[in-house]
C-alpha cells in the first residue's frame, strides 16, 4: 500500500501495483484507493487541489516523470473547466457507476488510458505549451525543465506512434 504519513512522493513511488487492488471503470481508468478520504466529495465547479506523482507505463529511461512534492507546488484547477485531462477529472468526481468520487485526504493510484489523457497534444505538438492552455497536469517547464522535457517526449510527440498510459498517484486535499 501507499503509506500515508510523511513524504507523499517517496512513499507513493515505493508502493507497487501488486500491493493495491485495482478496479476498472467503464471508461477504462484503472484505479485503487490506498487511503479512502473523509468528508464531502468535490463537485463540478469546485476547486480541486492535489499532490501527484506522475509516471508512465512505457518509457525507456525509467517510469517516473514528475512529482508536485519536489517543488512543493500542489496542482489546482476548477473542476469541469476543461483545464485538466478527462481521466483525472473522472477520478476526482467519479463516473456515477463503479468509479467512486475521491474524498479529501484520499490517496488513489490511477492508470489513465491514452484516450482520456494527452492524445490531442501528440496530434499537434504546438498546443503543448502551458501558456497555450494545454490540459494539465503538466510539469512546469521553467521550474522542472528536465521533467517537462521527459513528459513532452513521451506524451506530446507527434512522431511517437504509441502513447503509453499515464500513472498518477494522487492525494486530494480539502479546502486549502
Q: Can you annotate each of these PLM segments?
A:
Residues 32, 78, 171:
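Residues in well-ordered beta-strands of folded domains
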Residues 1-51, 159, 174:
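Start-of-domain signal
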Amino acid at each position: 500500500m501507499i503509506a500515508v504519513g510523511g513524504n507523499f512522493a517517496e512513499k507513493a513511488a515505493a508502493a507497487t501495483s501488486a500491493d493495491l487492488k485495482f478496479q476498472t471503470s467503464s471508461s477504462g481508468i484503472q484505479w485503487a484507493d490506498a487511503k479512502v478520504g473523509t468528508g464531502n466529495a468535490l463537485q463540478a465547479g469546485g476547486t480541486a487541489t492535489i499532490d501527484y506523482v506522475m509516471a508512465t507505463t512505457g518509457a525507456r529511461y525509467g517510469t517516473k516523470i514528475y512529482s508536485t512534492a519536489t517543488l512543493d507546488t500542489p496542482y489546482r484547477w476548477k473542476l469541469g473547466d476543461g483545464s485538466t485531462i478527462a481521466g483525472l477529472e473522472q477520478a476526482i468526481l467519479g463516473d456515477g457507476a463503479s468509479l467512486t468520487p475521491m474524498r479529501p485526504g484520499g490517496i488513489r493510484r490511477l492508470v489513465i488510458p491514452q484516450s482520456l489523457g494527452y492524445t490531442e497534444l501528440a496530434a499537434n505538438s504546438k498546443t503543448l505549451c502551458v501558456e497555450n492552455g494545454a490540459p494539465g497536469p503538466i510539469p512546469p517547464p521553467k521550474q522542472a525543465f528536465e521533467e517537462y522535457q521527459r513528459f513532452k517526449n513521451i506524451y506530446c510527440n507527434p512522431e511517437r506512434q504509441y502513447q503509453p498510459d499515464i500513472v498518477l498517484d494522487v492525494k486530494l486535499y480539502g479546502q486549502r
